[in-house]
């Protein structure tokens, strides 16, 4: 397939005429005569002085630093001079507090420079990590082809990583693999689309769609929050029988997190996974609610309705969402809607209990505003793992329990016939959770979210926006101390 040049990338993404190069003459390093001739030929053929070009431009008026490979220059390979150029650009972006767009197209380490070139990936990765630790967005667009040490370093450290359709993306290039092992690498593995399916990257985006996607992402990542919408008048909470709420939460047509994003959010950018395999039961996104920027982490309802079961991969994705929110200093919105944990040998061997524990510990101590929402079923450890936020909202028919009511009945009565009775006794419905201080606000349903999905999504969006707006005003140490004290006192006698 044809390759996207750095010129084509800049023209497609940046505001017209906004690019300013940061590059000076490449660092002079001692080279053999044969390599010097290769460099001279590459410069003559491409008009570029190295395999990497850096600078800054604007995306819809926002300053953005840019680092991009030119594959036609020695396969976009990275030697000492190219690595020094990349590192200097990343350090400058950090110093000037700019978001960074990196677009590799490279075979990896420049073999003509050997081990010294190989070690350059360390300083590039270090510079990018420091940029990330400065809470600055790092966005990656992988172009065809990206392999080797480039993919295994600065190509895989993005907060958001997307790739060109059809691009060859992988660690070891297929030609090298075949020469080393005598067999061709399995087809269809090292493709952008396959990596997207497996959660290694966040999306596959054509070049002509990259600019609007970056605009949406930057709107969430760096633009200021908008003024808060007019406050809603609190509605009285009807006395709904517990089992009616359980039944309502299981309706096949009940809106889930995707409907909330579609109807209640703007500037949505869906993220894919954890770099360890996609978890279809968990959704991760950037979005704004009522003009308030957030990271959204939601448990997805199963296709055809009902709750999904949550396994260790979904919880790893939840942890990625928590880390992303903290690293970018964005409020985190968590949507709970799960029938319970996945119960299988694979889940046990995948560390389900440990992932629940890590989610729980990381969320309750997270250094950013957090809002949890009991949207429907809140059953078991996966629900608990996403609950301990600064503020907890519940849909009228949302509920929270250590097990599905049928499971609790099986333990206590050795049958499932007492599920409704036990659900009421355990205080799992939203009204009971409000009384016990577990929930702060109940979002009404008239009479059921499934009967008014768009109106409900807008109502919930407004409630989220109000909570996020209020939490952002509280100093981080005070917010964290209040959160810890809140969960320290759950279940204790009130003064």
Swiss-Prot record:
<dbReference type="InterPro" id="IPR011762">
    <property type="entry name" value="COA_CT_N"/>
</dbReference>
<dbReference type="InterPro" id="IPR011763">
    <property type="entry name" value="COA_CT_C"/>
</dbReference>
<feature type="domain" description="CoA carboxyltransferase C-terminal">
    <location>
        <begin position="242"/>
        <end position="470"/>
    </location>
</feature>
<dbReference type="InterPro" id="IPR000438">
    <property type="entry name" value="Acetyl_CoA_COase_Trfase_b_su"/>
</dbReference>
<dbReference type="GO" id="GO:0016740">
    <property type="term" value="F:transferase activity"/>
</dbReference>
<dbReference type="GO" id="GO:0009317">
    <property type="term" value="C:acetyl-CoA carboxylase complex"/>
</dbReference>
<protein>
    <recommendedName>
        <fullName>Probable biotin-dependent acyl-coenzyme A carboxylase beta3 subunit</fullName>
        <ecNumber>2.1.3.-</ecNumber>
    </recommendedName>
</protein>
<dbReference type="Pfam" id="PF01039">
    <property type="entry name" value="Carboxyl_trans"/>
</dbReference>
<dbReference type="GO" id="GO:0005886">
    <property type="term" value="C:plasma membrane"/>
</dbReference>
<dbReference type="GO" id="GO:0003989">
    <property type="term" value="F:acetyl-CoA carboxylase activity"/>
</dbReference>
<feature type="domain" description="CoA carboxyltransferase N-terminal">
    <location>
        <begin position="1"/>
        <end position="236"/>
    </location>
</feature>
<dbReference type="InterPro" id="IPR029045">
    <property type="entry name" value="ClpP/crotonase-like_dom_sf"/>
</dbReference>
<keyword id="KW-0808">Transferase</keyword>
<comment type="subunit">
    <text>The biotin-dependent acyl-CoA carboxylase complex is composed of an AccA protein, which contains the biotin carboxylase (BC) and biotin carboxyl carrier protein (BCCP) domains, and an AccD protein, which contains the carboxyl transferase (CT) domain.</text>
</comment>
<dbReference type="InterPro" id="IPR034733">
    <property type="entry name" value="AcCoA_carboxyl_beta"/>
</dbReference>
<comment type="similarity">
    <text>Belongs to the AccD/PCCB family.</text>
</comment>
<dbReference type="GO" id="GO:0071768">
    <property type="term" value="P:mycolic acid biosynthetic process"/>
</dbReference>
<comment type="function">
    <text>Component of a biotin-dependent acyl-CoA carboxylase complex. This subunit transfers the CO2 from carboxybiotin to the CoA ester substrate.</text>
</comment>
């Amino acid at each position: 397939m044809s390759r996207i040049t750095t010129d084509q990338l800049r023209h497609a993404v940046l505001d017209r005429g906004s690019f300013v190069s940061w590059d000076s003459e490449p660092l002079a390093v001692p080279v053999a005569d044969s390599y010097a001739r290769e460099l001279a030929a590459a410069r003559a053929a491409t008009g570029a002085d190295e395999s990497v070009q850096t600078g800054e431009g604007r995306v819809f008026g926002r300053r953005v630093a840019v680092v991009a490979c030119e594959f036609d220059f020695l396969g976009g390979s990275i030697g000492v001079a190219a690595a020094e150029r990349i590192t200097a650009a990343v350090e400058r972006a950090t110093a000037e507090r700019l978001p960074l767009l990196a677009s590799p197209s490279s075979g990896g380490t420049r073999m003509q420079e050997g081990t010294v070139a190989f070690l350059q990936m360390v300083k590039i990765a270090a510079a990018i990590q420091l940029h990330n630790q400065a809470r600055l967005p790092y966005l990656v667009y992988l172009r065809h082809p990206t392999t080797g040490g480039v993919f295994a370093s600065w190509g895989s450290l993005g907060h958001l990583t997307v790739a060109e359709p059809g691009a060859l993306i992988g660690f070891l290039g297929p030609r090298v693999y075949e020469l080393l092992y005598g067999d061709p690498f399995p087809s269809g593995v090292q493709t952008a689309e396959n990596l997207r399916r497996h959660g290694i990257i966040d999306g596959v985006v054509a070049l002509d769609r990259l600019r609007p996607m970056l605009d949406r992402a930057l709107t969430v990542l760096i633009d200021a929050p908008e003024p808060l919408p007019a406050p809603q008048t609190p509605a009285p909470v009807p006395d709904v029988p517990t089992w009616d709420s359980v039944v309502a939460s299981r309706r096949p047509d009940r809106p889930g997190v995707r409907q909330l994003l579609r109807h209640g959010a703007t500037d949505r950018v869906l993220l894919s996974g954890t770099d360890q395999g996609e978890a279809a039961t968990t959704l991760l996104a950037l979005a704004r609610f009522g003009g308030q920027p957030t990271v959204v982490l939601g448990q997805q309802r199963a296709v055809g309705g009902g709750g999904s079961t949550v396994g260790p991969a979904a919880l790893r994705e939840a942890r990625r969402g928590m880390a992303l929110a903290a690293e970018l200093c964005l409020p985190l919105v968590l949507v709970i809607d799960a029938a319970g944990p996945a119960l299988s040998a694979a889940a046990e061997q995948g560390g389900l209990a440990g992932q629940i524990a890590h989610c729980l510990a990381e969320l309750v101590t997270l250094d950013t505003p957090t809002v949890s929402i009991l949207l429907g079923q809140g059953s078991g450890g996966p629900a608990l793992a996403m609950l301990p936020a600064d503020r907890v909202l519940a849909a009228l028919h949302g509920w929270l329990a250590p097990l599905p009511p049928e499971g609790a009945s099986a333990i206590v009565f050795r049958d499932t016939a007492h599920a409704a009775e036990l659900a009421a006794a355990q205080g799992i419905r939203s009204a009971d959770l409000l009384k016990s201080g577990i929930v702060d606000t109940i979002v009404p349903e008239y009479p059921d979210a499934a009967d008014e999905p768009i109106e409900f999504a807008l109502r919930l969006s407004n409630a989220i926006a109000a909570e996020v707006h209020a939490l952002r005003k509280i100093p981080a140490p005070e917010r964290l101390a209040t959160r810890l004290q809140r969960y320290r006192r759950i279940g204790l006698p009130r003064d």
